[in-house]
Amino acid sequence: MRYSQYFIPTVKETPSDAEVVSHKLMLRAGMIRKLAAGIYNYLPLGLRSIRKVEQIVREEMNRAGAIELLMPSVQPAELWQESKRWEQYGKELLRFKDRKDAEFCLGPTHEEVITDLVRREVKSYRQLPLNLYQVQSKFRDEIRPRFGLMRGREFIMKDAYSFDVSSEAADTSYDKMYQAYRRIFQRCGLKFRAVEADTGSIGGSSSHEFMVLADSGEDAIVSCTACEYAANVEKAEARLFPSEHAEPRELEKVETPQKRSVEEVTTFLGIPASSLVKTLLCVADGEPVAALVRGDHDLNEIKLKHLLGCEELEMASEEIVERVTGAPVGFAGPVGLKIKIVADLTIQGMKNFVTGGNARDLHFKNVNIGRDFTPALIADIRNVVHGDPCPRCEAGHLEMWRGIEVGHVFKLGTKYSESLRATFLDADGKEQVIFMGCYGIGISRTVAACIEQNHDADGIIFPIPIAPFHCIISAVSTKDAEVVAACDELYRALTAVGVEVLFDDRDERPGSKFKDADLIGIPLRIVVGSKNLAEGKVELKSRKGGEVSLLPLAEAVETVKGLVVAALNQ
């Protein structure tokens, strides 16, 4: 493709509404343009990278035995009402009515539609297992769409759904897809981690997220330094700390005037944050609950919500805190509290700690569990922190990372098949419920995540497998007939051996061409100038490492081909 005949509207200035690196660079590189909040046009360069990801996904899905189909974006309300997600999904589900007043939604996901299809068509165990997938645009009405393709309202996604006769067979399907996902992100040239994760609104028994590692990632993840354990911080398990060996001291009231925060109280009392216990008031399905965590730890609301088995969990308002404890925010404590108390595992082994005193400007010292209060539940309800011991092995500790979720796999079990009555007849002619799994990859999000992970001050650094083009040829001067002829010959020869080439034939200054080449992130750049050409050589530069080498013109094609083939076959 010749640059002069292509559509690459690069810009020098960063748009003011762009916040994260990928959003800024995709706009500057002419890959996307905003149409409305969270809705983008994919321009030719951006679309080429998206199609590369799609192709890798399709190849690995097909390799894993999945079969492609395409389902409607518009879905009838009846299916969502059957699964009980019509109201549960919240305002992100864009609902509307047609001219006959029938209710519909724009699909953010397709569990209901695929289950309806399968329940109509699959009748016998002989038709199972079955794995169906699609690549399609989806819509979620995000309240604050931001970060370009990282959190848009409309996005391109691959979603797959497996159907099996038993839980054991479903585990096999899940493992196949898990391995397929690993291959997909490896082939995309990304650094990633597969981590244990919460199932969220999709539901099911267990799940894994695939996280592209990036400092700008929205998600905190942890991994063990010694074993394969990795998890989203929402899901990561905390191990029980050894108990403190100390004799309980007499409970003591201490005045703490205007000292509310952990930092203020611990500084005033001259103690570490690990010797204080925070009492956090929550409301679970309308009922107040007190959650206790150590002063240097944070409450994990997802763990607490699962533990309590509630539908809704939120932090209590100042009014509720004062009504329940008799004190303003900052002075709540478990001693004498008349509501359900849930204590983190860490507190079980603590002795003589500090808590709020349930009165203004008052705290308790030398509080001990069992003597001074008795929790209704003691469980893991905190976020793990860097350096915590691994919950799976004795040798390692947990390290913290930032990640961008690009894929998610779920074991759904019978959640949807039961509510939508998707069944089959087994070998004995008995009706059984189908076991399901679902598997999503954010196609457009993967491209943005790649840029978050691979960039520098000059622009994007695409891995070869998902770059819009493998190589760019830059003619130093388009007025030099020999230079142009050499570029033309290189372009034809590279294209003939399967290398995707962008020939920058514009009548622009070399510096301007090089800046654009760096900005749009083409992995390999061949520079053809009259001086080197007179010696039968061209310059080859790697966008990733910045290495520059002079090659004999006769070797350039095979050298570039070798680099591309090696990257595509990794």
Swiss-Prot record:
Q: Which UniProt keywords apply?
A: Aminoacyl-tRNA synthetase, ATP-binding, Cytoplasm, Ligase, Nucleotide-binding, Protein biosynthesis
Q: Which PROSITE patterns match?
A: AA_TRNA_LIGASE_II
Q: Which Pfam families match?
A: HGTP_anticodon, tRNA-synt_2b, tRNA_edit
InterPro entries the record matches: aa-tRNA-synt_IIb, aa-tRNA-synth_II, aa-tRNA-synth_II/BPL/LPL, Anticodon-bd, Anticodon-bd_dom_sf, Pro-tRNA-ligase_IIa, Pro-tRNA-synth_IIa_bac-type, Pro-tRNA-Synthase_IIa_type1
Q: Where in the cell is it found?
A: Cytoplasm
Q: Spell out the molecular function terms from Gene Ontology.
A: aminoacyl-tRNA deacylase activity; ATP binding; proline-tRNA ligase activity
Q: Which SUPFAM superfamilies match?
A: Class II aaRS ABD-related, Class II aaRS and biotin synthetases, YbaK/ProRS associated domain
Broadest EC class assigned to this enzyme: ligase
According to the UniProt record, one GO cellular component term is: cytosol
- Assigned EC number: 6.1.1.15
Domain of life, source organism? Bacteria
Catalysed reaction, written as an equation = tRNA(Pro) + L-proline + ATP = L-prolyl-tRNA(Pro) + AMP + diphosphate
- Which PANTHER family does the record associate with it? MITOCHONDRIAL RIBOSOME PROTEIN L39/PROLYL-TRNA LIGASE FAMILY MEMBER, PROLINE--TRNA LIGASE
Q: How does it assemble?
A: Homodimer.
Q: What is known of its domains?
A: Consists of three domains: the N-terminal catalytic domain, the editing domain and the C-terminal anticodon-binding domain.
HAMAP family, alphabetized: Pro_tRNA_synth_type1 (MF_01569)
Task: Spell out the NCBIfam families in the cross-references.
Answer: PRK09194.1, proS_fam_II
Q: What does this protein do?
A: Catalyzes the attachment of proline to tRNA(Pro) in a two-step reaction: proline is first activated by ATP to form Pro-AMP and then transferred to the acceptor end of tRNA(Pro). As ProRS can inadvertently accommodate and process non-cognate amino acids such as alanine and cysteine, to avoid such errors it has two additional distinct editing activities against alanine. One activity is designated as 'pretransfer' editing and involves the tRNA(Pro)-independent hydrolysis of activated Ala-AMP.
State what protein this is by name: Proline--tRNA ligase
Which species does the entry assign this protein to?
A: Geobacter metallireducens (strain ATCC 53774 / DSM 7210 / GS-15)
